[in-house]
Amino acid sequence: MTVLEQSFSLDGEDLPFQAGDTVLQAATRVGRYIPHLCWHPDFAPHGSCRICTVKVNGKPAAACTVMATPRLDVESHTEELNAQRKTLLQMLFVEGNHFCPSCEKSGNCLLQATAYEMGMDGPHFEEFYPDRPVDASHPDILLDFNRCILCELCVRASRDVDGKNLFAIGGHGIGTRLLVNSDSGRLGDTDMGLSDRAAGICPVGVILPKRRGFVIPIGERLYDRKSVSEHAQDRS
């Protein structure tokens, strides 16, 4: 059996995989959508959001960290797993301040698109309405900490690609938050630039370029035209 002939089962369908693939990587390559937030194809898996949780041979596991091997039986799109994903999404929405109608990221936001995909029509839980700052100290980039989902993509991009290590995650439990690695804690006191990988990696609306709001009209944005699962199918 060649590398490309190896396969595992995803929701009853045989999926090919390459050596070193995770379940999520293999599924994404062939256009099979497994919901996720913190995973990005250019970075090592993080496994923090748990949205990609699947059942592997009957046991729950994160699809972004489980290595694909022959004879795996993976379940993803089941009523039970999608209900769990919806609950996790609802918790993310109430834990932050996500006001989609007025957010510049609306239509391009992976959190919003995933909530639509999972049929989330309300937060269900009581809103926290946390008091979080907006950092406008940088001349070209705005940081709105209200929307952070702690995916750490900006942390990894700044450290591993830009070589600047401008962001970190600090605190514990409900107090966990995104930090700027400067003496003042302000982005304006760093050398971050718009061309940095970290400047464009945020899946929600935390890191935004200034003076570019709504350049692409609502209704013509990435997930306005097609759902997140349809985009996954297009990439195959």
Residue spans for each PLM region:
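Eukaryote-biased recognition of intrinsically disordered, low-complexity regulatory segments
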Residues: 2-13
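Short glycine-rich loop/turn motifs that provide flexible caps or phosphate-binding loops at active sites
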Residues: 11, 19, 46, 172, ...
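A structural connector/turn signal
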Residues: 12, 38-41, 143, 187
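N-terminal cofactor/phosphate-binding cores enriched in small/glycine residues
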Residues: 15-69
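Fe-S ferredoxin-like electron-transfer domains
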Residues: 50-54, 59-236
